[in-house]
Each structure stands twice: as structure tokens, then as C-alpha cells.
């Protein structure tokens, strides 16, 4: 048989016509105001690694192949939760090289090829790719926007295929900023308990919630196995260190769950010793760092609301560091290209996130505030002029 490529991969790996246009336009424009900034590193607010190097560097050359991850680092993650009102035993904390790897471990642990995962729409396209690479299928449930607020369409959870194994919650959601309420959580848990699903909560943006909504660590989950995913990428703005975690409540799966997760993780042992060593002192400063990031985000949210006062344009952002803007009558791909061509402003078009209607764009709340404000005023002028 002729060698070919795995059916896990898309048949067409080339860039879409839109991205070819966008790339060509970037080359022509040369410089632009970037409203797609995805990390504090690129936004000029990095974590001060020099402040923790002396505390960590002595362990850079240590090799301790624990399938759950270094105990001292798991203890640091447990303290991270405790500082925020959560309580997890270190035995139920699994360290990974990234949130993506945490997904991969869970998919291998809980699913068989052909099984299904329920994912939120609008949502981040990476989730579909991660599932496909494990021979899994994704099916949508929906967040709807009305009166300037995003809400779970709990009825859409009922349209699930029989092979569903996991309900995936992203809270705060990327890109809408929706945060699960207790009522929405209870509806999800009720469905998961009845249908024998696990719940995976991607809360990488969980440190950045602005409306006082609790994180669901202490809410009732009945007998449902629940996994909470996070990492250094967002909590201390350091994606370059490649360390994530899952903290879990085994529910009906009991003690065997830990054995199963460790079995899969032990096959990879992906996290480096420097990442383990640095995570411990970095997490001890995570609340201080959070305050720096949150100031930038809140300043930009204030600017956003002053420029676009209407909730029809900017629905409420409960958390995260992105905001979704809707311009009725616009085509989001056309608007994205027009903003770059005419004003040197780079945004993300809504179709990347499967928004249900046209006219959505997504902007980062990490961009330096004066540049952010200037760009928003140009966007407002451009969209109101049409």
C-alpha cells in the first residue's frame, strides 16, 4: 500500500483564500496596530522571570520522572487554587506540558475513536483540531446573545449524539467572554449526570473574571467526573514555559481515574525540569501578576465601552482578554481586510470562531491602551460611515 497521510489530518492543509489575502495585505501595509495580541509577552507586560530565577535554577538539572509531575509543583498548584477559594488534593492534580496536552491525555483516557465531544459555539477552533487528532468528533452546543449578554442555550445540549463522552466548557469563553453562571452549571451537570458524561472545564482565563461570578470548583457536580484545566500560559502570562495542569474530582470513576490518567501521562513525561522548577515560585506571585494584567484589561474595557456604548455592538464581557464586537450589515471577512487596508488595524474575523451571523470581529484587550483607543475610534468611524 502506498504511504500517505493519516485521516486525522484535513485533506487540504493549505491556507484559505481569506488568509492568503490577509497575508498579502500585511506585506503591503508593512506595520499595523495589532488588536489580535494573544499573550502579555507581546503586549509589553511579561512576568519578571529574573525575580524567580535564583529560587528555581538549582533544580533545572534535576530529573524526577513522576507521571503526575513534580510534587512540589503540584503543591504550588494546590496553593494557587486555595488562594482563590478552591480545594484540591495534590493527588488529583496532573501536570502537563500545556492545556492542549491535558486535552490529549483526557481524550485518550476517556474516549474511543469515533466518540463525540460537545464544544461551545462560538468557540476557539483549536478544540476541533485537538479532537480530530484523536479520531474524535465534535458537536456544537450554543451560546446565544440577547440584550447585550451571552447565555448558554441549555436546550442545545439536548441535541447530542449517542456516542458523546465529554461536555467541554470554556469559562471564560474565548472569544465571547461568557462565564458560566451557577444556574447554567447546574443545567450542564444535570445533563452530564443523566447521560454519563464527564465535564472538562477549560478555565485558562479563569483569573480574569470581572463581574464577581464564582469559579465552579465548589459547586455541586453530583457523580460527574469534572476536570479543571489551566496553566502558566495565562495565569502568569508565560506560554514559553510550557506547563499546564488539570485538577479533577473523580466522581463516579473513583480511584481508577488517577491510575488511568497517570498511565497515559507516563508515556510522554513532557514537562521539562526548568518548567517544573520555575512554576513553583512563579505561582506564588500569580496574584500580583494578575493585578497588572487585569489593570490593562479593565482600562481597555472602559475605553471599549466609551467608544461603543451600545450593547448591540459590544455585548457584556464577563471575563477573559478578548471582546467580540458586532456591526450589523457588515461582512466580517470584508471588514477585517478593509480595516487593515484603510487604517492599518488588525482584528480577527468572527467566522474563525463560528459566530452564527455575519458582522462579528474579535479584538484583544491586551493591546497598549492608547493604541487600543486610537484603533477603536477608527473602527467606529469606519463602521458608522457606511
Predicted region positions:
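Generic structural signal for small/hydrophobic residues in well-ordered secondary structure
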Residues: 35, 77, 93, 117, ...
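Conserved core of the PLP fold type I
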Residues: 61-191, 206-220, 227
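PLP-dependent enzyme catalytic core of the Aspartate aminotransferase-like
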Residues: 79, 87, 158, 338-347, ...
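Hydrophobic residues in well-ordered beta-strands that form the structural core
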Residues: 119, 140, 201, 347-349
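Conserved core segment of the aminotransferase class I/II
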Residues: 222-298, 383-384
Amino acid at each position: 500500500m502506498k504511504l500517505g497521510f493519516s485521516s486525522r489530518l484535513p485533506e487540504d492543509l493549505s491556507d484559505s483564500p481569506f488568509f492568503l489575502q490577509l497575508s498579502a495585505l500585511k506585506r503591503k501595509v508593512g506595520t499595523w496596530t495589532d488588536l489580535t495580541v494573544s499573550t502579555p509577552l507581546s503586549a509589553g507586560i511579561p512576568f519578571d522571570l529574573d525575580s524567580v530565577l535564583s529560587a528555581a535554577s538549582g533544580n533545572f538539572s534535576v530529573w524526577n520522572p513522576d507521571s503526575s509531575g513534580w510534587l512540589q509543583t503540584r503543591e504550588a498548584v494546590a496553593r494557587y487554587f486555595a488562594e482563590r477559594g478552591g480545594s484540591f488534593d495534590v493527588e488529583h492534580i496532573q501536570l502537563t506540558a500545556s492545556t492542549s496536552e491535558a486535552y490529549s491525555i483526557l481524550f485518550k483516557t476517556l474516549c474511543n475513536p469515533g466518540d463525540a465531544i460537545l464544544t461551545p459555539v462560538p468557540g476557539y477552533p483549536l478544540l476541533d483540531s485537538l479532537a480530530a487528532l484523536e479520531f474524535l468528533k465534535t458537536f456544537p452546543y450554543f451560546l446565544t446573545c440577547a440584550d447585550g449578554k451571552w447565555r448558554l442555550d441549555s436546550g442545545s445540549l439536548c441535541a447530542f449524539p449517542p456516542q458523546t463522552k465529554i461536555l467541554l466548557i470554556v469559562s471564560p469563553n474565548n472569544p465571547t467572554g461568557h462565564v458560566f453562571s451557577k444556574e447554567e452549571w447546574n443545567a450542564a451537570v444535570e445533563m452530564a449526570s443523566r447521560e454519563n458524561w464527564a465535564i472538562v472545564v477549560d478555565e485558562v482565563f479563569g483569573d480574569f473574571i470581572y463581574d464577581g461570578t464564582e469559579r465552579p470548583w465548589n459547586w455541586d457536580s453530583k457523580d460527574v467526573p469534572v476536570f479543571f484545566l489551566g496553566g502558566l500560559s495565562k495565569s502568569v502570562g508565560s506560554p514559553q514555559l510550557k506547563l499546564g495542569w488539570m485538577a479533577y474530582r473523580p466522581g463516579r470513576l473513583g480511584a481508577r481515574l488517577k491510575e488511568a490518567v497517570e498511565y497515559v501521562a507516563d508515556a510522554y513525561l513532557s514537562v521539562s525540569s526548568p518548567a517544573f522548577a520555575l512554576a513553583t515560585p512563579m505561582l506564588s506571585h500569580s496574584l500580583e501578576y494578575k493585578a497588572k494584567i487585569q489593570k490593562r484589561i479593565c482600562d481597555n474595557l472602559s475605553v471599549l465601552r466609551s467608544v461603543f456604548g451600545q450593547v448591540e455592538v459590544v455585548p457584556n464581557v464577563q471575563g477573559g482578554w478578548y471582546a467580540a464586537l458586532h456591526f450589523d450589515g457588515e461582512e466580517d471577512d470584508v471588514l477585517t481586510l478593509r480595516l487593515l487596508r484603510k487604517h492599518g488595524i488588525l482584528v480577527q474575523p468572527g467566522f474563525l470562531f463560528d459566530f452564527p451571523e455575519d458582522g462579528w470581529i474579535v479584538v484583544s484587550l491586551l493591546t497598549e491602551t492608547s493604541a487600543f483607543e486610537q484603533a477603536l475610534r477608527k473602527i467606529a468611524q469606519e463602521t458608522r460611515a457606511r
